[in-house]
């Protein structure tokens, strides 16, 4: 029986993970559920999955949950950073699903890595913000990190087994790999007139044509910043150079990514757009379990198409690739700026096209500094958020 902690239990990845657990009750148990403020959802999850611990990041939410949970469930309710670190590093825990969205997921995810846990990485911001430090800690502790994002999971599955065992410090060239082809649907605005983009609403941006996701990642998909963050994540996970990474627009979201080999072969991973597939793969690796996802029906798929990315339409993608080439300081700044600008857009404070403007301004104006520790990273994150918030208020 594999004991799991779900970071971000009330989010979409958390829900998909718990669905896979429910389909395989003889193999997995829930040690702890972690969420931010959603007490109602956490109540329902506690009653269904009976974890040993329920942790709320928000202190008031923890108090409310404690008052509402039946004592007969015998679930310990906790809050606070030190308590969260104790949960992910507990000897009772085998696997940590790292699915807290944004920079908030960095500290607990890194704590799990340092503790040598099996970490299922859905929080791409951890690598975007702390890439080199993250990989160094992973190598030092011997933690097994498996990529949950559908694209990175697809790449992982298309790699030779020896390369899979060297995530973070593999040699793609030695393995005969010429390119990693990172696919993306292009989101809901792929064919919208460029002149209409400033008028796009949060509701329109969140209406992804293929995937069901949270609001923040949906907006990132509309701007293709999500693909940009995945580009940065792929650089660290697969130790890839800029020459080895390519982004391919694939509107149908059937091919989740590809690996191109020196001999001309291209290996792709295909499947229905359902996050339970990569989650189940990571949970059971190197075995296979039932994910609950319907098999792909090739007769219904029809045509598969591919396009080069249009950087005029998707300036956030260009910013992310450029930041990746600049280095760790730039990607940390970009991530912080993007979280502020997307939140402002979702609150109807700025236009959709202002997201890229805020991000670009922060990249050019926030002073870059050496990042030698997690404290340095968090300090730059706070500094950038302050600058981005001030800039948002000027728009």
Curated annotation (Swiss-Prot):
GO biological process: isopentenyl diphosphate biosynthetic process, methylerythritol 4-phosphate pathway involved in terpenoid biosynthetic process
Enzyme class: oxidoreductase
Reaction equations catalysed: 2-C-methyl-D-erythritol 4-phosphate + NADP(+) = 1-deoxy-D-xylulose 5-phosphate + NADPH + H(+)
Names of the cofactor(s): Mg(2+); Mn(2+)
This enzyme's EC code(s): 1.1.1.267
Key words of the record: Isoprene biosynthesis, Manganese, Metal-binding, NADP, Oxidoreductase
Binding site for Mn(2+): 149, 151, 230
Residues annotated as binding NADPH: 10-13, 38, 123, 125, 214
InterPro entries attached to this UniProt entry: DXP_reductoisomerase, DXP_reductoisomerase_C, DXP_reductoisomerase_N, DXPR_C, DXPR_C_sf, NAD(P)-bd_dom_sf
Pathway the protein takes part in: Isoprenoid biosynthesis; isopentenyl diphosphate biosynthesis via DXP pathway; isopentenyl diphosphate from 1-deoxy-D-xylulose 5-phosphate: step 1/6
Residue sites binding 1-deoxy-D-xylulose 5-phosphate per the record: 124, 150-151, 185, 208, 221, 226-227, 230
GO molecular function, one term: NADPH binding
Keyword Glycoprotein applies: no
Family statement: Belongs to the DXR family.
NCBIfam families xrefs: Dxr, PRK05447.1-1, PRK12464.1
Function: Catalyzes the NADPH-dependent rearrangement and reduction of 1-deoxy-D-xylulose-5-phosphate (DXP) to 2-C-methyl-D-erythritol 4-phosphate (MEP).
Protein name: 1-deoxy-D-xylulose 5-phosphate reductoisomerase
Annotated source species: Shewanella woodyi (strain ATCC 51908 / MS32)
């Amino acid at each position: 029986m594999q004991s799991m902690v779900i970071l971000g239990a009330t989010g979409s990845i958390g829900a998909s993970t718990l669905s896979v657990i429910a389909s395989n009750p003889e193999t997995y148990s829930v040690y702890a559920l972690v969420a931010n403020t959603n007490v109602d959802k956490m109540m329902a999850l506690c009653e269904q999955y009976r974890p040993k611990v329920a942790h709320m990041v928000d202190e008031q939410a923890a108090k409310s949950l404690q008052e509402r949970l039946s004592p007969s469930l015998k679930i310990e309710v906790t809050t606070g950073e030190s308590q969260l670190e104790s949960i992910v590093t507990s000897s009772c825990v085998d696997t940590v699903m790292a699915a807290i969205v944004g920079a908030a997921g960095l500290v607990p995810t890194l704590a799990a890595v340092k503790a040598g846990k099996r970490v299922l990485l859905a929080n791409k911001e951890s690598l975007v913000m702390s890439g080199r430090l993250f990989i160094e800690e992973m190598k030092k502790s011997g933690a097994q990190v498996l990529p949950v994002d559908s694209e990175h999971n697809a790449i992982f599955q298309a790699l030779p087994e020896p390369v899979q065992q060297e995530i973070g410090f593999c040699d793609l060239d030695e393995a005969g790999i010429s390119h990693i082809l990172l696919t993306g649907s292009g989101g809901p605005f792929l064919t919208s007139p460029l002149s209409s983009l400033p008028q796009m609403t949060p509701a329109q941006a969140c209406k992804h044509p293929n995937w069901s996701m949270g609001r923040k990642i949906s907006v990132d998909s509309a701007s293709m910043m999500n693909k940009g963050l995945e580009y940065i994540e792929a650089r660290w996970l697969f130790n890839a150079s800029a020459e080895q990474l390519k982004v391919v627009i694939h509107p149908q979201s059937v091919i989740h990514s590809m690996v191109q080999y020196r001999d001309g072969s291209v290996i792709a991973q295909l499947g229905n757009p359902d996050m339970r597939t990569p989650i189940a793969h990571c949970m059971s690796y190197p075995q296979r379990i039932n994910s609950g996802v319907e098999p792909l029906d090739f007769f219904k798929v029809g045509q598969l198409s591919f396009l080069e990315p249009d950087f005029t339409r998707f300036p956030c993608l260009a910013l992310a690739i450029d930041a990746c080439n600049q280095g760790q300081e730039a990607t940390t700044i970009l991530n912080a700026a993007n979280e502020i600008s997307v939140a402002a857009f979702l609150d109807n404070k700025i236009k959709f096209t202002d997201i890229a403007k805020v991000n670009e301004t922060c990249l050019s104006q926030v002073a870059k500094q050496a990042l030698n520790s997690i404290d340095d990273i968090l300090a730059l994150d706070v500094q950038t958020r302050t600058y981005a918030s001030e800039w948002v208020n000027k728009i």
